[in-house]
């Protein structure tokens, strides 16, 4: 564009997914090589700063190796003596809400020659008690400028205010808006709720008008979806924007496209490393060099040379003439031929790839009318020839059955997110057990399980337990001050506490449904198949948080404690009093379970910090059994000869006669968790010493045979 002093040069990239496949011997360095090339291109083109659109890391808690490699790359390319030729003229304490509150190159203790601005994505989003992400680590090291981190407040679905980072270079003024990833369903409702999303415009000063600013928005959300409630429509965005960088979608659509009737252009750089082997990922990878002067911009796409070659093909066996349905050897020979041709094609060096790498090969096979073959066995012959010998083939049925649902072009469902089925099965398994719990809601356990597995939060279950115990203790103590609670009423009161929490969730779910109704009315026929929403979008392959938690509700109005997670949705619950999912299932779907007696005794022992010998523990167990035996006379003598139901069969049927006979034992187990140490000692003295013959009972029913 000429006149370099007034031209702002920005290198745009998204979805680097650093650390992806870090345990794979062949592909472990792919993400780092691509990211280093991006930084190298920024240095070669002498850009003013690098703009990243989220998902810098693949894992929410990246490994030490990943963090070290990332810091090494940023330190190598960002810390130098090159002068920074632009200024940030906005309130930096608002733009960068960390302890230091300023852009990194203005720190006198660091020589930052290449500033990096980034938002968070759905993979590296803030989580935990302090609402921190892995990007906060890089920000604390003064290596990146982390912006677009929203504090969801207000009532209902929440409220956010998007403040721009105001950048000035000569006569060019750029307002850089950042919006880190927010759950799509929630952000969708927020855009349709008046005044829920406030866009702050630059103030008029020094003879400048608002129209003098070139407005850029970078966000990380679903874009192409059939179900409009699980994505963000471009028409939700304000018309004053000039240019939008769309992250999260992995298909490279680097050329800016104008949105009809909106007046702005959208670029979708896509990912720099293939994380899901689908057709969209097979397109060449690029980054965008954006040059801005005044209110004009010039885009230049730059191909990435370090990306591992990836070739994708689709085969319909019934359409192949030389394949016999009754001869598996002919099927193998035909597929071998296709794989060999793709390997040969990828082995030829090109201008964009001077060095050849082992390629990624994926063949989608429509095996309608044929029998499948073992993909692992098929790939053994290609070890050392391709980078993914274990999953070259993926089998699918004919799409005719899918087309009968009224939705065409349904492909790649099993490949976009191959782990969805397993996670849904785990969630369903917890619900199917129908275990009657007295204190812990199943929804809380689902969330704790997700955080433990996906977020590597080792304290997830402990925090869940402590939070619910604290709520139950608080409720019992408040009622004990007003009314005298007898020993026999404790278990009833515990159940009432549980039901009250369930009822609160239900009420907030109904309240939240009011915000959903507007979005349902706007749905104009694109929601015939919900599964289609995962197919038309080439977004990252592990967007599991929305799936697992999409239909769940959380404890609304929980008392804040040291283990409460104020991350995105959890913060919303504490501040807005609404459910974090907005589609709570109410009390009808709440499943609870009975506390395991032995676990309850162990929890009581840990809480009271008593050190007991093994003989004392054995005596306590015997006394517990004796309480059960002493409760037998509550039944009429005519029932002594009646056959008892097996422990398995009694599960999930309410209390009945069995619960009545074991009532005092349940009281003792729960009282040991909720009451003080002194009360436990008094109960031990009051228990009978010589009970009738012992009867074996099952108190937990947590094992399914």
From Swiss-Prot:
Location in the cell: Nucleus; Chromosome
UniProt feature, compositional bias: Basic residues: 641-663
Biased composition (Polar residues): 515-538, 589-605
Region (Disordered): 505-705
Superkingdom, natural source: Eukaryota
One Pfam family matching this protein: Mre11_DNA_bind
Organism the protein comes from: Oryza sativa subsp. indica
Binding site for Mn(2+) 1: 15, 17, 55, 250
Keywords tagged on the record: Chromosome, DNA damage, DNA repair, Endonuclease, Exonuclease, Hydrolase, Manganese, Meiosis, Metal-binding, Nuclease, Nucleus
Cofactor: binding comment: Binds 2 manganese ions per subunit.
GO biological process: double-strand break repair via homologous recombination; double-strand break repair via nonhomologous end joining; meiotic DNA double-strand break formation; mitochondrial double-strand break repair via homologous recombination; mitotic G2 DNA damage checkpoint signaling; telomere maintenance
One GO cellular component term noted in the UniProt record for this chain: Mre11 complex
UniProt entry tagged with the keyword DNA damage: yes
Main location per the UniProt record: nucleus
Protein name: Double-strand break repair protein MRE11
Assembly with partners or alone: Component of the MRN complex composed of two heterodimers RAD50/MRE11 associated with a single NBS1.
Cofactor(s) this protein requires: Mn(2+)
Entry-linked InterPro entries: Calcineurin-like_PHP_ApaH, Metallo-depent_PP-like, Mre11, Mre11_capping_dom, Mre11_DNA-bd, Mre11_N
Stretches with biased composition (Basic and acidic residues): 505-514
UniProt xrefs under CDD domains: MPP_Mre11_N (cd00840)
Family, per entry: Belongs to the MRE11/RAD32 family.
Residues the record marks as active site: 123
GO molecular function, one term: single-stranded DNA endodeoxyribonuclease activity
SMART domains linked: Mre11_DNA_bind
Role: Core component of the MRN complex, which plays a central role in double-strand break (DSB) repair, DNA recombination, maintenance of telomere integrity and meiosis. The MRN complex is involved in the repair of DNA double-strand breaks (DSBs) via homologous recombination (HR), an error-free mechanism which primarily occurs during S and G2 phases. The complex (1) mediates the end resection of damaged DNA, which generates proper single-stranded DNA, a key initial steps in HR, and is (2) required for the recruitment of other repair factors and efficient activation of ATM and ATR upon DNA damage.
Residues annotated for Mn(2+) 2 binding in this entry: 55, 122, 220, 248
């Amino acid at each position: 564009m000429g006149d370099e002093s007034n031209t702002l040069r920005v290198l745009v990239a998204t979805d680097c997914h650093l650390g992806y496949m870090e345990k794979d011997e062949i592909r472990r360095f792919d993400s780092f090589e691509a990211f280093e090339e991006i930084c190298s291109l920024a240095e070669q083109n002498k850009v003013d700063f690098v703009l990243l659109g989220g998902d810098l890391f693949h894992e929410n808690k990246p490994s030490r190796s990943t963090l070290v490699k990332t810091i090494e790359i940023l330190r190598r390319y960002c810390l130098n003596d090159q002068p920074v030729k632009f200024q940030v003229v906005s309130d930096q304490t608002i733009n960068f809400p960390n302890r230091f509150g300023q852009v990194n190159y203005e720190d006198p203790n660091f020589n930052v020659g290449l500033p990096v601005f980034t938002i968070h994505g759905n993979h590296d989003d803030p989580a935990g008690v302090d609402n921190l992400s892995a990007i906060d680590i890089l920000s604390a090291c003064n290596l990146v400028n982390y912006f677009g981190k929203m504090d969801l407040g207000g009532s209902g679905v929440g409220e956010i205010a998007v403040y721009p980072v105001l950048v000035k270079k000569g006569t060019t003024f750029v307002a850089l808006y950042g919006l880190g990833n927010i759950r799509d369903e929630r952000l969708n409702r927020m855009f349709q709720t008046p005044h829920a999303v406030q866009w702050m415009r630059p103030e008029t000063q020094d003879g400048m008008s608002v129209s003098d600013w070139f407005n850029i928005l970078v966000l990380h959300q679903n874009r192409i979806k059939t179900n409009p409630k699980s994505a963000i429509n471009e028409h939700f965005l304000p018309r004053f924007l000039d240019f939008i960088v769309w992250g999260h979608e992995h298909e490279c659509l680097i050329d800016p496209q104008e949105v009809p009737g909106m007046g702005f252009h959208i670029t979708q750089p896509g990912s720099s490393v293939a994380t899901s082997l689908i057709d969209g990922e097979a397109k060449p990878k690029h980054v965008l060099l954006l040059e801005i002067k005044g209110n004009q911009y010039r885009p230049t796409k730059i191909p990435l040379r370090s990306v591992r070659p990836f070739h994708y093909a689709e085969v319909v066996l019934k359409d192949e003439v030389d394949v016999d349905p009754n001869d598996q050897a002919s099927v193998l020979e035909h597929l071998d031929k296709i794989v060999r041709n793709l390997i040969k094609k990828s082995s030829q060096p090109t201008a964009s790839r001077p060095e050849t790498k082992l390629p990624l090969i994926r063949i989608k096979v429509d095996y309608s009318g044929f029998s499948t073959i073992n993909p692992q066995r098929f790939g053994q012959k290609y070890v050392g020839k391709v980078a993914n010998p274990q999953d070259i083939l993926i089998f699918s049925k004919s799409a005719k059955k899918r087309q009968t649902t009224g939705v065409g072009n349904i492909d790649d469902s099993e490949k976009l997110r191959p782990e969805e089925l397993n996670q849904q099965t785990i969630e369903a398994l917890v619900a199917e057990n129908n275990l009657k719990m007295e204190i812990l809601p199943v929804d809380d356990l689902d969330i704790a399980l997700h955080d433990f597995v996906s977020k590597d939060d080792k304290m997830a279950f402990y925090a869940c337990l402590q939070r619910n115990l604290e709520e139950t203790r608080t409720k019992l103590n408040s009622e004990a001050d007003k009314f005298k609670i007898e020993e026999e009423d404790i278990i009833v009161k515990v159940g009432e506490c549980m039901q009250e929490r369930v009822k609160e969730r239900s009420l907030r779910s109904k309240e939240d449904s009011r915000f959903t109704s507007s979005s349902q009315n706007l749905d104009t026929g694109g929601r015939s198949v919900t599964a289609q929403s995962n197919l038309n979008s080439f977004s990252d392959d592990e967007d599991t948080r929305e799936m697992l938690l999409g239909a769940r509700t959380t404890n609304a109005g929980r008392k804040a404690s040291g283990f409460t997670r104020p991350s995105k949705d959890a913060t919303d619950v504490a501040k807005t009093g609404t459910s974090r999912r907005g589609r709570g299932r109410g009390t009808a779907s709440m499943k609870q379970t009975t506390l395991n007696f032995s676990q309850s005794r162990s929890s009581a022992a840990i809480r009271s910090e008593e050190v007991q010998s093994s003989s004392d523990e054995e005596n306590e167990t015997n006394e517990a059994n004796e309480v059960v035996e002493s409760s037998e006379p509550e039944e009429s003598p005519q029932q002594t000869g009646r056959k008892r139901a097996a422990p398995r069969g009694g599960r999930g049927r309410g209390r009945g006669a069995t619960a009545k006979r074991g009532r005092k034992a349940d009281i003792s187990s729960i009282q040991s968790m909720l009451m003080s140490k002194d009360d436990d000692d008094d109960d031990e003295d009051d228990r009978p010493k010589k009970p009738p013959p012992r009867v074996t009972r099952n108190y937990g029913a947590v094992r399914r045979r």
